[in-house]
Structure formats: C-alpha cells, structure tokens
Amino acid sequence: MKNWISSFILVHQEKSISFNTNILETNLINIIILLIILFYFLKGLLKDNLSSRQENILSTIQNSENRINEANERLVDAKLQWSQAQITLEELKNQTLQNKLILFNAEFEIKNQVLSQHFNNLLMTLYYREQQAFNNIKKQVSELALKKVIAKLQAPLMEEDQSVIIINKIHRLGGNLE
C-alpha cells in the first residue's frame, strides 16, 4: 500500500508532500489506471457527441430523401403538364387546319388574320408554359445538386469541429495531449 501511495505522492526528506509529475516512470499500473479513468470520464462525452452526429446525419439523409421525392413528384407533374401541353397543341393544330378549310369558303382575309393571331397567342402561351415547366425542373435539379454538394462539403468540417471539442475537453480535465 505504501508503494501504491508513493507512486502518486513523493515524500522528500524534508517531509513535504508533492505530486509525482513523471507518471511514465512510476509503473505500468498507474498508466493503466489513468487510461481507465480517462475512458470512464470521456466515454459519455464521446457517446453523446457520436450519437448527436449520427442523429444529424440521419436527419440530413431523411431530409435529402424527402427533397428528392418532392423533386420527383414535381418532375412527374411537369411531365404531365408537358404531355397535356402537347395534346393541347395537337388539338389546336387540328382545329386550326379545320378552320383554315372553312375560311377558304368564307371571308378569307379577315378570318385568317383573327385565326392566325389566336393561334400565335396560343403558341406563345404554350411556349410560356413549356419554358415555365422546364425552368421549374431545372431549378429543382439545381437545388438538389447544390444541397448534396453542400452536405458533402460540410461533413468533413463537422468532424474537425468534433475533434477540436474533444481536445478542448481533454485539456479542461487536465489531460496532456501530445
């Protein structure tokens, strides 16, 4: 027991008490005890940090999957709008051809101008809807790509932040990290 106490505390000839700062020269048992104590006090901190990091990663993955599903739904809606626009365009083309045949028999010049103007307006409307659908798809794909890139860039930074926090905690507990 005396050796046990003397490995931590040195009693000099003047009878003064001080801590033995050279732990590596004391013995292997003290080193093992020190490691056990450090592990005991730091395991809760490490477990909390790792579990919170895991929760963050899982929530980020879930959010990304939700955004991808939303983007897929929007893509399906945009494709449906596109097909409806194509059907409407075909119907308009058929109607225009029928109207042109009728116009040859009646007042050709006036009705032709009105019909052409109407057809151009419809084409402009369809073109606008087509561009709007394309821009929506492009925007969603760009947002998803940027979010994935940002998530990939932030992941290593967050791991470095975790190591800085752990090193600071070790220094607060009086540990020496070399």
UniProtKB/Swiss-Prot annotation:
A GO cellular component annotated for this chain's UniProt record is: proton-transporting ATP synthase complex
- Keyword match Transmembrane: yes
Q: How does it sit in the membrane?
A: Single-pass membrane protein
**Subcellular location, principal:** plastid
Write down the InterPro entries for this protein, in alphabetical order.
Answer: ATP_synth_b/b'su_bac/chlpt
For this protein, the parts annotated as crossing the membrane are: 26-46
Entry keywords, A to Z: ATP synthesis, CF(0), Chloroplast, Hydrogen ion transport, Ion transport, Membrane, Plastid, Thylakoid, Transmembrane, Transmembrane helix, Transport
| Coiled-coil region | none
Which GO terms fall under molecular function for this chain's record? proton-transporting ATP synthase activity, rotational mechanism
Q: Membrane: present as a keyword of the record?
A: yes
Give the matching PANTHER family.
ATP SYNTHASE SUBUNIT B, CHLOROPLASTIC
The family assignment reads:
Belongs to the ATPase B chain family.
In its miscellaneous comment, the UniProt entry states:
In plastids the F-type ATPase is also known as CF(1)CF(0).
Q: How does it assemble?
A: F-type ATPases have 2 components, F(1) - the catalytic core - and F(0) - the membrane proton channel. F(1) has five subunits: alpha(3), beta(3), gamma(1), delta(1), epsilon(1). F(0) has four main subunits: a(1), b(1), b'(1) and c(10-14). The alpha and beta chains form an alternating ring which encloses part of the gamma chain. F(1) is attached to F(0) by a central stalk formed by the gamma and epsilon chains, while a peripheral stalk is formed by the delta, b and b' chains.
What the protein does? F(1)F(0) ATP synthase produces ATP from ADP in the presence of a proton or sodium gradient. F-type ATPases consist of two structural domains, F(1) containing the extramembraneous catalytic core and F(0) containing the membrane proton channel, linked together by a central stalk and a peripheral stalk. During catalysis, ATP synthesis in the catalytic domain of F(1) is coupled via a rotary mechanism of the central stalk subunits to proton translocation.
Protein name per the record: ATP synthase subunit b, chloroplastic
What organism is the protein native to?
Vaucheria litorea (Yellow-green alga)
